[in-house]
């Protein structure tokens, strides 16, 4: 068990890692949605996980906040953190993922490295999805 001083030191270390150490003494209601997500990531990092699970980490965030959260997640990936991410942010997935798994109605429809997934999808469902999201 950590002492109070050790816990505060560790908390500050992870708040710095997610780029919001200046928010340490604020209540959740005083933080933006993106800041709240980054606090959640910092809180999880305090447990020294081997893998982190993210379920739509950018849902309900505005574009600026989405960038803040995705930048933190890119940093985690670059540091070697294993992440399982459910996302509709295809640009982020293309950049960070080692492996893409596309699901439809609870079933795995396609599994491939990002380059193959985006450039040479096998299933008709994946092709349809990509044609709809990549046209804008």
Would you name each region that the model predicts?
Residues 41:
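Hydrophobic anchor residue at the start of the ABC signature
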Residues 52-55:
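Catalytic Walker B motif of ABC-type/P-loop ATPase nucleotide-binding domains
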Residues 87-88:
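H-loop/switch region of ABC-family ATPase nucleotide-binding domains
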């Amino acid at each position: 068990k950590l002492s109070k001083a050790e816990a505060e030191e560790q908390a500050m270390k992870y708040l710095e890692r997610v780029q919001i150490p200046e928010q340490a003494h604020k209540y959740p209601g005083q933080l933006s949605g993106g800041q709240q997500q980054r606090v959640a990531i910092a809180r999880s990092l305090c447990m020294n996980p081997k893998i982190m699970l993210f379920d739509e980490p950018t849902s309900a965030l505005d574009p600026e906040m989405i960038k803040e959260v995705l930048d933190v997640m890119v940093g985690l990936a670059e540091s070697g953190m294993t992440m399982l991410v459910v996302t509709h942010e295809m640009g982020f997935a293309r950049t960070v993922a080692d492996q893409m798994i596309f699901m439809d109605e609870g079933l795995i429809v396609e599994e491939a490295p990002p380059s193959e997934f985006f450039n040479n999808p096998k299933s008709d469902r994946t092709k349809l999805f990509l044609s709809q999201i990549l046209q804008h």
